[in-house]
Amino acid sequence: NTWISENSGTSNLLSDVIYENGTLITIGGVFVDNVSTVLKSSNGKTWTSITTGTTKILYDVAYGINKYISTGSYGEVITSSDGSSWTLRSSGTTNQLHGIEYGNSVFVSVGDGGTIISSSDGITWTSRTSGTAYYLKGITYSKNIFVVTGAGGTILTSSDGTTWNTRNTGTSVSINGITYSKNIFIAVGDSGTILTSSDGSSWSSKTSGTSNDLESIHF
């Protein structure tokens, strides 16, 4: 209920945060100024700015097989084993990569134009067929499946990150974020849209009580 403002040391946009192995990593940047931002903290109070070797804005960060991977604008992918030293990787795309998740021994990143790329090591990336040209934004992995959300009411699912299935959502608005909690997938989007599913395949609309756009959800 009570929040305390901490000094991050930056005025740049911060897009995402992750906590693994006693370390907090938050990422972001400034799109128009070509500025990339990575901050690292062990306690959430004191933050250290990290040099990444990229000037692209970063949108999302995931952790798997003992490494952090962050994705961003113009197909940017950077990896790190400790959150301090980062290496630029070739993603094979120049599209914006809005989301990344790790599951079933594979990293999956999604972005503009229906872009989906996957990698088993975070170094070598392969383009996958999504079946849509809509931009893709949200991604989560639970119950042995990846679930991806995007524009035009898009929800896609995959068990392996390679083969993707389109699901009927009953809406055409952008679905921006997704999470998994208490045996239910919950997706949120524009115009106050909330959708739920027990399996990622069949979706039901719920009343949110707002018509405002919902950008993200976490549990």
Give residue spans per PLM region:
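Residue-level hotspots at or immediately adjacent to binding/recognition sites across diverse folds
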Residues: 1-219
